[in-house]
Amino acid sequence: MKLVLNNRDEVFDGNQHTVSEIFKIMNFTFPRVVVKLNGKLIKKPQYHETIVNDGDNLEVIHLISGG
């Protein structure tokens, strides 16, 4: 499966994965993120059920706070 992840072409085994599976494959462990799939905001409770398909555009924005 090919997709655009954070403006980079990525290739994964299989035809589809959930957002949570992509996080695990990519070792994303950020505590606060904003996720958009094909321009649509995906809320954290939906990560396990939201399917990412071949050709999709997935954006994972890591939020950082500081003082």
Where are these regions (language model features)?
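Ubiquitin-like/PB1-type beta-grasp interaction modules and other compact soluble beta-rich domains
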Residues: M1-G66
